[in-house]
Amino acid sequence: MEFINVGDIVSVPFNVACGRCRTCRAGDTGVCLTVNPGLPGGAYGYVDMGGWIGGQARYVMTPYADFNLLKFPDRDQALAKIRDLTMLSDILPTGFHAAVKAQVGAGSIVYVAGCGPVGLAAAASARLLGAAVVMIGDMNKERLAHAKEVGFEPIDLNSHDRIGELIEAVIGEPVVDCFIDAVGFEAKGHGGAEQPAVVLNQAMDVTRYAGSIGIPGLYVTKDPGSHDKQSAKGALSLNFGLGWSKSQSFHTGQTPVLRYNRQLMQAILHDRIPIAKIVNAQVISLEDAPKGYVDFDKGEAVKFVLDPHGTVAKAA
């Protein structure tokens, strides 16, 4: 290790990447070819991602540290924004990657499916990229209320799931330029029934011809807990012919955090994106983590930040 010193404050991407293989050199650090003997891509504390010990602990070992770690340039400046900077490890780059891949730009009309932290980060990223309207849909009323409070257009899916009609009520037409799926395979249809493909099919339905769909939501190669035999094998019932006929673009996969985290750090340090407020970040101790998991699983409109050494709480 040559460039990181004792006492530096750094951000650790959730990806584990070597920095030397073909995909890393191309900037696709989410699918590093060398850090996982089972398949491309490594991550901390996640099944099938190379056996790297998770980061929700007092200490973590980071391989290839000079390549993977993002050092904050000024300690005092970083501590002043530390709650926001904690989001650089995962959800902010993930949301930004989704918005970029959905081709959000100046004047775009954007719909984000899912009002959790990643969905809110995607909505914030769309706004940063110049979107004219950012709608965000969910059935969780607490999360919808928070989304409205931080400046997004909430779409309440409790009444019905005809997304086009709900979008038309906001912008006057039932189509969007850019669609972001921040839900993934755990999606449920109206009424709460398991429908792993429902968001993807809605995306193809309401995204305009030649529009783009960014998919940060997780989809798996197999889902043993699914009640549907096809979904259990990772096979979804997609209306893909519709997407093909509309010349839509689809972008999936793990976010290559290193592609974006330095630029997003600058956006945070220079007050362009108050991401901690947007995702309602709440700092808790490592001892309180089990309760945090339970509360988050209940759908609370909070992004918990584990603070094992009290550094974040002291700075805030």
Spans of features found by a protein language model:
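Conserved S-adenosyl-L-methionine
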Residues: 128-133
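N-terminal Rossmann-fold NAD(P) dinucleotide-binding loop
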Residues: 119-120
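NAD(P)H dinucleotide-binding glycine-rich loop of Rossmann-like/cofactor-binding domains
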Residues: 18-113
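C-terminal hydrophobic helical "lid"/dimerization subdomain
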Residues: 160, 174, 191, 254-316
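Glycine-rich cofactor phosphate-binding loops and adjacent beta1-alpha1 units
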Residues: 102-104, 145-247, 290, 313-316
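Conserved acidic E/D residue at the C-terminus of a beta-strand in Rossmann-like folds
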Residues: 138-139
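A glycine-/small-residue-rich N-terminal strand-loop-strand element
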Residues: 1-16, 73-81
